[in-house]
Regions:
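Bacterial N-terminal signal peptides that target proteins for export
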Residues: 1-11
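C-terminal segment of classical bacterial N-terminal signal peptides
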Residues: 15-24
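A residue-level marker of the well-folded mature domains of exported/periplasmic proteins
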Residues: 3, 23-313
């Protein structure tokens, strides 16, 4: 056998470089823990994250509990993700306080956390990629007020009172109505856990209790679809304003059952989350908030290219 020391050295160096590259690829693992999977919204966020993973050459996983009521399950998922010692992680909190002990653990282990969609009550996240939910819900209030003639009774069917999105959308809507429309009375705020069946039942009970109700705001995809179904089942004429999109909501707007809705930019949220996580692993400075934008859409602009770009089925 002819031994070539130079060749052996080259092979050795190549193998070492290969190992380093493999280790680096393994290090660049970024898990995203979302609030759920039951809404098409989260599938759209995932598609943005997957695209960013391709563009930035990192490995991304995307998971969430079956429903947005499963706070404990989400915490378990977060714990498992941190245990894998990822390069960074993305987190959309169901309960903005419940996750704090684990987020402190991530911080102690120098794992950058990027909050997305729903922030947490802490300065641990290096940034939050999200819609300005208070401003978006305030716009929803303006639209609903105009549609009912700026007077009468309205209600809110919210998805929860524990997440940042749930609180901000509720408060943004309620505060705007109270400050700008003195002749409009918010008769009740009810919670349907973002589940369309629960939100349907909540809506029906509201309609029974308030026969003069003129409008309802549903704060996310499941809530809004539940409101539409409840109003349809009760055969009532009520102005409905929703949030997010999805086929059922879009169909309701086209048919006139729903007046319009606020859409976020879910693909953009997913993309910017992974992009920010990659930058955080490199020590790059990030803004505290990455505002991913929102739009009002109704029958008049649902087919506008600017709007169709941020809608999903």
């Amino acid at each position: 056998v002819i031994r070539n020391p130079l060749l052996n050295a080259i092979v050795g160096v190549t193998f070492a470089v290969g190992l380093t590259a493999a280790a680096h690829a393994q290090e660049a693992y970024i898990p995203l823990i979302s609030k759920g999977f039951q809404h098409q919204f989260w599938q759209a966020v995932k598609s943005g994250a997957v695209q960013a993973a391709k563009d930035y050459h990192v490995k991304v996983t995307f998971e969430g509990p079956e429903t947005e009521a499963m706070i404990d399950k989400q915490i378990d998922m977060l714990s498992a993700a941190i245990a894998k010692k990822p390069a960074a992680l993305g987190f959309a909190a169901l309960d903005s306080k419940a996750a704090l002990p684990l987020l402190k653990k991530a911080q102690a282990e120098k794992i950058p956390v990027v909050a997305f969609d729903s922030g947490v009550d802490s300065d641990i996240p290096v940034t939050t990629a999200a819609t300005n939910n208070k401003a978006a819900a305030s716009l929803a209030a303006d639209k609903l007020a105009e549609l009912i003639g700026k007077e009468g009774e309205v209600a809110v069917v919210a998805h929860d009172q524990t997440s940042r999105t749930g609180v901000d959308r509720r408060d943004g809507f309620v505060e705007r109505m109270k400050s700008a429309y003195p002749k409009i009375r918010i008769v009740t705020v009810q919670y349907g856990e973002g589940d369309q069946l629960k939100s349907t039942e909540v809506t029906k009970s509201i309609l029974q209790a308030y026969p003069k109700l003129k409008g309802i705001f549903g704060t996310n995809e499941g809530s809004a679809i539940g409101v539409v179904n409840g109003v349809r089942e009760m055969k009532r004429k009520v102005v409905i304003v929703g949030y997010d999109s999805g086929k059922q909501q879009k169909d309701a707007i086209r048919s006139g059952l729903m007046a319009g809705a606020i859409t976020q930019n879910p693909v953009g949220i997913g993309y910017r989350t992974v992009e920010a996580a990659v930058k955080a692993t490199k020590g790059e400075k990030l803004p505290k908030i990455i505002d991913t934008g929102f739009y009002w859409y109704d029958k008049t602009n649902i087919d506008d290219p600017k709007i169709t770009a941020v809608l999903y089925d």
